[in-house]
Amino acid sequence: MPLLWLRGFLLASCWIIVRSSPTPGSEGHGSAPDCPSCALATLPKDGPNSQPEMVEAVKKHILNMLHLKKRPDVTQPVPKAALLNAIRKLHVGKVGENGYVEIEDDIGRRAEMNELMEQTSEIITFAESGTARKTLHFEISKEGSDLSVVERAEVWLFLKVPKANRTRTKVTIRLFQQQKHPQGSLDTGDEAEEMGLKGERSELLLSEKVVDARKSTWHIFPVSSSIQRLLDQGKSSLDVRIACEQCQESGASLVLLGKKKKKEVDGDGKKKDGSDGGLEEEKEQSHRPFLMLQARQSEDHPHRRRRRGLECDGKVNICCKKQFFVSFKDIGWNDWIIAPSGYHANYCEGECPSHIAGTSGSSLSFHSTVINHYRMRGHSPFANLKSCCVPTKLRPMSMLYYDDGQNIIKKDIQNMIVEECGCS
């Protein structure tokens, strides 16, 4: 039974390899049009007819992805002036200085944004009481300290207002960052001593907001620039003093917390009567202040750099991406394809030695690593399997073209252009 299961897994794995490498296309077409990278890699490159054969493979692939059996017959092309006017009105593209149409690459931008969002971490850090009165301490996790580009950072505070409050409708809340300096480098003065600030410290206004004091609710204070400075300095903690001079007059209170339990304080930092009841504290636990951080690693961060596929330069024989551009004007297709001017029909070629099979960054890396583990140890039936050089990253492409009825069509095609190659 285990052997039968193993054979089944092997067959499924081979099917995954075959199905993962091509660009998806319509059913009912041959494998070559569905996978230009695979088709181009198998064609001879040195023969006299190699270039025409490669171009024909690209043509079939484009028609397949547009769900066309043949190229549209454009017998009476639309006058260029009318075409350009329609494009401007429909906002599907723009006309360059050279008169050529350029497509607004919304799909490409969306793909880049999605990739960026996948690399962004969101961290919520709950506050602890600081070393002085009315201060909060936020300790960013190790996950956060490994990030270096702040997309967004906010401190969330809950303002509790008694139901009978009508004396003041607005209060001002200020957040000050507590900064520690080397001994003797700063004159803190009497005010710092009154605030309970020990040592050489200064304050920097982080955020200021006028809020409604007629209802209990959360208030958000942006602190992105401050968190960015902390990360740039290699620090991972933020100390904040909260100030609300009008809170006492209005009866409102900011919900802060102590070392072991949360407490309510008024504008002067004094504990309010009746706020230490166990039931009340349990009820208010959800109002604990917190810091919300969205950040990512920088482009040049050593841990962020994933292994990118090689570019074929004629000097390497291992798996790499071969650049191949087909101009629609050169192949006589610019009469029905309005934009872009050509297609980057990149493909993968090269050898896959055992030591690079299943490399990091490949969408097939986990599967490949498992197979390669058994293959290198001679375990049958994996011993005779060979790694393949396949696309590991593809990007979309937008096309603007005429159909047989002289209609202008804009189509966004996923997984159209090979960006990186790797060993399966």
From Swiss-Prot:
Disruption phenotype: Activin A-deficient mice are born but die only within 24 h of birth because of craniofacial defects.
Recorded GO CC terms: activin A complex; enzyme activator complex; extracellular region; extracellular space; inhibin A complex; perinuclear region of cytoplasm
Disulfide bond as UniProt keyword: yes
Distribution of this protein across tissues and organs: Uterus, ovary and liver.
Cysteines paired by S-S bonds: C312-C320, C319-C389, C348-C421, C352-C423
MF GO annotations: cytokine activity; growth factor activity; hormone activity; identical protein binding; peptide hormone binding; protein-containing complex binding; signaling receptor binding; type II activin receptor binding
Location of the region described as Disordered in the Swiss-Prot/TrEMBL record: 264-306
Sorted UniProt keywords: Cleavage on pair of basic residues, Disulfide bond, Glycoprotein, Growth factor, Hormone, Secreted, Signal
Residues that span the membrane, as ranges: none
Chief location category: secreted
Residues annotated as signal peptide: 1-20
SMART domains to which the protein is assigned, alphabetical: TGFB (SM00204)
Domain of life, per lineage: Eukaryota
GO BP, one annotated term: roof of mouth development
Subcellular location: Secreted
Compositionally skewed regions (Basic and acidic residues) per UniProt: 264-275
Keyword Iron part of the UniProt annotation: no
InterPro entries from the UniProt entry: Cystine-knot_cytokine (IPR029034), Inhibin_betaA (IPR000491), TGF-b_C (IPR001839), TGF-b_propeptide (IPR001111), TGF-beta-rel (IPR015615), TGFb_CS (IPR017948)
Subunit: Dimeric, linked by one or more disulfide bonds. Inhibin A is a dimer of alpha/INHA and beta-A/INHBA. Activin A is a homodimer of beta-A/INHBA. Activin AB is a dimer of beta-A/INHBA and beta-B/INHBB. Interacts with FST and FSTL3; these interactions prevent activin A interaction to its type II receptor. Activin A interacts with ACVR2A. Activin A interacts with BMPR2. Inhibin A interacts with ACVR1; this interaction creates a non-signaling complex (NSC) that inhibits ACVR1-mediated BMP signaling. Inhibin A interacts with ACVR2A.
Entry similarity comment: Belongs to the TGF-beta family.
Protein name: Inhibin beta A chain
